[in-house]
Each structure stands twice: as C-alpha cells, then as structure tokens.
C-alpha cells in the first residue's frame, strides 16, 4: 500500500513539474504571463506520510458513517423570499463506500407533483480539512459542488459552493447548505440561494429528516 501511494505521489509530482515548466515556457511567449507558484520538492518520506494521512479515514469519516441508513424527510420549499411554502415528503438512503471514505446518498421524492431523484457524494478531505460534496438530480444536467467546515458547537456542517443558474446562461449562483445533526435519529438540512428578483440570499428549502 505504501509503495502504491508513493508511486502515485511520484507520478503526480512529475506531472505537476511538467505543468510548471509548460506554464513558464508558454508564459514567456505572451505579453501577459501568469506567475506560477514556485515548485517546492518534497522528500519521499514526507510525501509517503502525506499520502497515507490523506488516504486514512478518521473521526470525521466515522461521524459521517453514523448517518448510514434510510431517512424520511419532511420537505418545505420556497420559490421566492416571503413566498408561499410548498411541502412534500422524501426519502434518503445513505451508505459509506470505499472502506468508509465516502458516503453516497440517494434521494427520492416529488417536486411540484413530478417525481424527483437525486444523488450526492460526501466526504471529509483530510488534506483540505474540509467536507466536500457533489450533487446531481433529474431536474438538471449540471453538478453542484460545495465545501464545508464542521461547527462542533452547533453540531452542523455549513457547505458553500456554486450551482448552475439556467435563467442566466453561462453564469453560476452562490448556494449554501447547513446540515445540523440534532441527534442520532434526527437531522435538518437548510438550503439558501439568491432571490430571483433581488439576488439576495434567502432560505429556499428545509428538510427535517427522521431515521427510519
């Protein structure tokens, strides 16, 4: 395992070195050159330990694993700030994968009378010291990507990221999600996005989950 990780690290460093050289070369041919960060070599022992630490699940992954199972969701949505709430029910099934490194979640429900399905992959990136997440569903063709930090006092993860705004072609909009782990059988997800009229952030969705 250690040899495999070291080999992977060596390949990545080789590719990165070539990229730095390429950036420097191409930059010299242009008037507006991009200043690249100086590459600092890392010895094999340090690189090997870094990859081992990066690949080893820890406490944050164990915390994610506690959410494994099936959850029933009570969903409330708002199409605009101060608008009439719409309610529906949903179901989410969470399962850790790749020896406890990632959690895949499959969601089913309805949106304005139409069947809704979505899937997320969530992980704790040991190198970034952040949670990372992706989301896809049958109501779009893009991928939402967010990163978040754990707040121990609130028992919550606050994710921030970008998602496609199809009403403004070629542009993304800011999105924020707060996952609160109330206890082992109750969780709440709050989602915030821009109001279509003002662009100001407001709560677009809230899902109260109860473990089945």
Residue positions per predicted region:
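Edge beta-strand at a domain terminus
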Residues: 186, 191-212
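C-terminal motif of bacterial Sec signal peptides marking the signal peptidase cleavage site
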Residues: 15-16
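Central antiparallel beta-sheet cores of small beta-barrel/beta-sandwich binding domains
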Residues: 74-176
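Sec-dependent N-terminal signal peptides
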Residues: 5-12
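N-terminal helix-cap/turn-to-beta initiation motif at the start of protein domains
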Residues: 55-72
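Short, low-complexity, disordered segments immediately C-terminal to signal peptides
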Residues: 20-36
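Residue-level recognition of beta-strand termini and adjacent short loop/turns
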Residues: 98, 181-185
């Amino acid at each position: 395992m250690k040899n495999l990780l070291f080999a992977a690290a060596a390949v990545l460093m080789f590719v990165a070195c070539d990229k730095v050289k390429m950036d420097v070369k191409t930059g010299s041919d242009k008037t507006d050159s991009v200043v690249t960060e100086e590459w600092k070599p890392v010895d094999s022992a340090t690189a090997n330990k870094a990859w081992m630490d990066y690949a080893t699940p820890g406490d944050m992954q164990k915390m994610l694993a506690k959410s494994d199972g099936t959850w029933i969701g009570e969903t409330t949505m708002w199409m605009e700030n101060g608008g009439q709430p719409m309610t529906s029910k949903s179901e989410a099934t969470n399962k850790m994968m790749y020896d406890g490194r990632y959690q895949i979640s499959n969601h089913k429900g309805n949106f304005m009378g139409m069947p809704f399905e979505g899937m997320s992959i969530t992980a704790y990136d040991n190198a970034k010291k952040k949670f990372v997440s992706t989301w896809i569903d049958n109501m779009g063709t893009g991928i939402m990507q967010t990163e978040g930090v754990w707040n121990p006092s609130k028992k919550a993860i606050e994710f921030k990221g970008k998602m496609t705004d199809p009403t403004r072609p070629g542009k993304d909009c800011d999105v924020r999600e707060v996952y609160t782990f109330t206890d082992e059988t109750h969780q709440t997800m709050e989602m915030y996005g821009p109001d279509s009229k003002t662009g100001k952030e407001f709560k677009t969705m809230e899902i109260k989950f109860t473990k089945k």
